[in-house]
Amino acid sequence: MNGLHIALVGARPGSEIRQLITDHQAEITLDLTCTGIQRSYDLNSEQILPAYAHALLDQLPCMRMAAASNRQRILEAYEDRIDGIIYHTVKFCDIYAYEYTKLHETSNLPILKIETDATAQCGGQILTRLEAFLESLRAQKGESMLFKNKRQQSENYSTETQDAVSDTANAKTANTTDAPVYVMGIDSGSTSTNAVILNGNREIVASAVIRTGAKSGESAQRILEEILQKANLQRSDLTKIVSTGYGRVSIPFADENVTEISCHGKGAHYLNPEIRTILDIGGQDSKAIHLNEKGDVTDFVMNDKCAAGTGRFLEMMARTLEVDISELGPLSLKSTENIEISSMCSVFAESEVISLIARNKETSDIAHGIHMAIAAKAISLMRRVGLEPRFMMTGGVAKNPGVVKVLEEQLKAPLFISEEPEIVGALGAALYGLENIL
């Protein structure tokens, strides 16, 4: 059975979800969403109305209207022909949570739950989770996890970017089996853009971190120029470029892309093979990832519905306290009083902080309370994948000593943090590219 075969289950999704699945080289073999299985009827029948009514009644029902036990039996019958289940729910349609829970507990198949709000928008977070799930299924089948980039040069691409795309093709021609191998991984995040170059011996030649700014494509071009200068290399020396992060599909000179979840797992295992649980807190989301002894991602969860507990949240709190974000961590280490920030909503938490300022509480104590709230949310996320040591923290928030200290106290275990925790995703992307060509 070639390719990935997916069962789409749950509430009826919009066309965007189905399109995302098929765009990523997976087939919806079984559509068990409500009204998902379409029944045909004879248009020429003299009994067209009864035939039409029969077709409607034969559709899988919405769980609010009738029991969905029949589709569970269908799913069991197809289990040997399906690689995984994508379970879709609609926000506030809580009845589907019961079926998902039962499937999660009883099914032998990997299952991913995604929730949408029935609008036309399909966020980057859903794309990331969906791609990471499909990548994990491909890894289980021994298939390549790299996804080819579509180099459609739109009117938004600058002349420099188009030149970089041309340079990619020239690099392929220039590199022969005798030439040194250099692979670049680039992680285009919401806050920072990070890059790593590896040589053919899996050694880090150079790395770089810059602010993403308003356009991910332009920051990618800037970091390409910066890291090539650091490595004393030319563009034609690069054998392959692999992108990751939220902006991975917006980098036209990248050859292939992988999700940041897979890349963080690969990068973490390279830096420390003993790592089993990763906490990644970036600019707009946080993730907990579980690895096996081979470094494969076995489970992951994301907090991606709001900025609570992320780098953006910390930046907002720092502005409220009139403290530079780089000073917030060291400042919290001077705390002498435990203050609880009860709300993790950025707006409500800011109101709490303003109230604490009005009560003349010490800034260091408020900062410590903010870090305590972030740590509590992060550990709750980690518990969902299993708190198996050793633990590693990645992302820009790993540079905050206040958050790290509170996390280690609550975990009762040390966190492994690399010298530059923001490049772990880019490192993983480079490793995937290197494995693909060696």
Region annotations inferred by a language model:
Residues 9-73:
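Redox- and metal-dependent alpha/beta enzyme cores, enriched for Fe-S-associated oxidoreductases
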Residues 71, 349-382, 422:
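Adenine-nucleotide phosphate-binding core of ATP-dependent small-molecule kinases
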Residues 109-115, 260-261, 408-427:
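Conserved phosphate-binding/catalytic loops in two-lobed NTP-binding clefts
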Residues 158, 163, 167-178, 246-296, ...:
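Conserved phosphate-binding catalytic cores of ATP/NTP-utilizing and phosphoryl-transfer enzymes
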Residues 212-216, 293, 298-333, 337, ...:
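Glycine-rich phosphate-binding loop plus the immediately following alpha-helix
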Residues 246, 383, 387-410, 421-425:
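Glycine-rich phosphate-binding loops at beta-strand->alpha-helix junctions
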